[in-house]
């Protein structure tokens, strides 16, 4: 789910911590080099130390995102609890429930860098993984890839053709990462 947010509307958590820069992927951009991923990882107040330890680490998140980026990107991934997830979904989408992933796409910077925040609501992700019989790791990988594609303009809500294109990309990227088709 993508939320278009103008620069003056940045949520408080947007890009305040950078945890490294310049990870590389296997895809080359138009300039003949691999797209760069500048990645920050944050945790909401509801995420305790025990839960934080069970979440994917920055290096793993970067490994999952790299095949899903097609140009230089600056992403902040934020793991939140149900209250923050619900508040963000309500504020930006006018839906009064927490959802699995929200993508706050800020567009492309003048230098061509795609900037976005990917917010994952841990309790929702955990519940969905259990209900769908998926591993938690596979579900987090899928939702991060899904959010990254949204940040780059892919949108499954524009129609069946766009949904099919986005799903095919997700399936292909996840297969390259060693994960099963998330739609089965």
UniProtKB/Swiss-Prot annotation:
It is found in: Cytoplasm. Its cofactor is Zn(2+). One of its GO terms (cellular component) is cytoplasm. Residues 1-11, 19-29 have a biased composition (Acidic residues). GO terms for molecular function: metalloendopeptidase activity; RNA endonuclease activity; zinc ion binding. It comes from the Bacteria. GO terms for biological process: rRNA processing. Zn(2+) binds at residues 146, 150, 156. Binds 1 zinc ion. Keywords: Cytoplasm, Endonuclease, Hydrolase, Metal-binding, Nuclease, Ribosome biogenesis, rRNA processing, Zinc. Residues 1-37 are annotated as: Disordered. Its EC number is 3.1.-.-. InterPro entries: MetalPrtase_cat_dom_sf_prd, YbeY, YbeY_CS. It is an enzyme of class 3 (hydrolase). HAMAP family: Endoribonucl_YbeY. Single strand-specific metallo-endoribonuclease involved in late-stage 70S ribosome quality control and in maturation of the 3' terminus of the 16S rRNA. NCBIfam families: PRK13963.1 (NF010570), rRNA maturation RNase YbeY (TIGR00043). Belongs to the endoribonuclease YbeY family. This is Endoribonuclease YbeY. The gene is ybeY.
């Amino acid at each position: 789910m993508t939320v278009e947010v103008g620069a003056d509307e940045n949520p408080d958590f947007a890009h305040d911590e950078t945890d490294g820069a310049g990870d590389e992927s296997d895809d080359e951009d138009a300039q003949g080099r691999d797209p760069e991923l500048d990645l920050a990882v944050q945790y909401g107040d509801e995420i305790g130390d025990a839960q934080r330890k069970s979440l994917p680490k920055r290096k793993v998140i970067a490994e999952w995102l790299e095949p899903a980026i097609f140009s230089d990107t600056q992403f902040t991934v934020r793991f939140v609890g149900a209250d923050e997830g619900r508040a963000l979904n309500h504020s930006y989408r006018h839906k009064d429930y927490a959802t699995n992933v929200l993508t706050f796409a800020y567009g492309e910077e003048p230098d061509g860098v795609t900037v976005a925040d990917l917010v994952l609501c841990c309790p929702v992700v955990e519940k969905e993984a259990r209900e769908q019989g998926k591993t938690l790791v596979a579900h987090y990988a899928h939702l991060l890839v899904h959010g990254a594609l949204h940040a780059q303009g892919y949108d499954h809500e524009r129609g069946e053709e766009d949904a099919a294109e986005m799903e095919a990309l997700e399936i292909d990227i996840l297969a390259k990462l060693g994960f099963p088709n998330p739609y089965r």
